[in-house]
Amino acid sequence: MLFRSVPALAEIQLALQSAAASVTGEQADALKRRLRTGTVVTYDDRNWELRFTQERRRINLSRSIAVDMESGTIAAQGYRLRVPYGTLLCVSDKPLHGEIKLPGAANAFYERAVGEHLLIGLATLDSLRRNRHGLHSRKLRSFDEPPFR
C-alpha cells in the first residue's frame, strides 16, 4: 500500500491565502478559521478508512491536515516532477472527527461554497501569473529542464 505525505509549496500557500482574503473579505483569525493549508496524505488504496485504527498513527506522525485520494495523485506527481501544482478542496465533512455528512447540509454547503472556491482558485492563478518572476522554490523546475525537453 502506498502512503505519501505531500507537502504544500510556500509560494502557492501565500498566493492562496491572499486570494482567499480578497474574495471572502475576511482577515486574520476569521480567515484562519476557514482556510487551512499544509501537507496532505494520499493513498493508493481506496479502502484505507476500513483500517483507520492502524492508519491514524501514520497520519498523525505525518502532521498532515487532510487525507485526499483524487487531488493527492496530482500533487504527488507535481511534487515528484517539481512542477507547480495546486489543489483547492471544498471540504464539507470531517470524517476523522466522527461527524456525519448529511445530504441536505452538504447540498447547502456546496451551493454556497463552490462558486466562492472557484473565485479563490482563479484569483490565486492570476496572482501567481502576475508575480511569476518572483516565484522561486527549490521544489520547482522550469519547463526547459528534464523531463520536459
Report each predicted region and the residues it spans.
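Active-site-adjacent substrate-binding region
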Residues: 11-104, 108
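His/Asp/Glu-rich mid-to-C-terminal helical/loop segments that flank catalytic regions of hydrolases
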Residues: 95-149
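Short amphipathic alpha-helical segments
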Residues: 8-12, 113
